[in-house]
Amino acid sequence: PAATISYTGSPYCSNAGTATVTHTGTAGGTYSAAPAGLTINAANGDVTLGTSTPGTYTVTYTIAAAGGCAIFTTTTSITITALPVATINYAGSPYCSNAGTATVTQTGTTGGTYTAAPAGLTINAATGAVTLATSAAGTYTVSYTIAAAGGCPAVIATATISISAANAATISYAGSPYCSTVTSAPVTRTGTAGGTYSASPAGLTINAATGTVNPST
């Protein structure tokens, strides 16, 4: 007897279903594998990838001794790669632009690369760390990509991150000093709106919402 066997698709991804053997020569032999961990059909050599432990195995095809002929064996190898899985998260989002660095929480397969869209986010491609001060305020989608390898396709995990511009403002009363007969002294404000106005020491009549001062009272 004589035979050859091979798994021409090796390496296989663990999610690829079934790996079938290419066999030539004498039929009727049995298949076995070492080390333990490979789910293989002893009669036809089919390998169930999803229930096999990722790794490299030696598969042996054995034809029993018969008709005066000695036992015959031939071998081949098969490699199974675990399907990469990963999640990413920016737990502190939204961040203020003056908060330094935003770090990512990543689980699963390491070694991927980080990208972001749209443009404007300063992100470290290797670590996923975001430099907030040099990033434009807005909301971004960050993608963590594990490249295709070992028969497995590329895997992409995504997360969102939002950055708010730090509050900043200046105020001035351009007409100061005012005469006590003036009834309305408006404030000149630049920067972030929506704040409230107050004064010290006590004695100034000021509108907390607009900042307008009434010197006459």
Segments and roles (model prediction):
Residues 1-16, 21-28, 190-194, 202, ...:
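Low-complexity/repetitive intrinsically disordered segments
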Residues 1-8, 83-91, 166-174:
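Proline-enriched interdomain boundary motifs that mark the N-terminal boundary
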Residues 13, 66-73, 96, 149-156, ...:
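Short, exposed coil/turn segments at beta-strand boundaries within extracellular/luminal domains
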Residues 14, 30-44, 48, 111-131, ...:
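Low-complexity "stalk/linker" and mucin-like segments enriched in Ser/Thr/Pro/Ala/Gly
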Residues 16-25, 99-108, 181-191:
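A short beta-strand segment in extracellular, disulfide-stabilized domains
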Residues 51-55, 134-138, 215-217:
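Surface-exposed, short loops/turns at beta-strand junctions within beta-sandwich domains
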Residues 55-65, 138-148:
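A short beta-strand micro-motif common to beta-rich folds, especially ectodomain repeats
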Residues 76-82, 159-165:
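Interdomain boundary/hinge segments at the C-termini of tandem beta-sandwich modules
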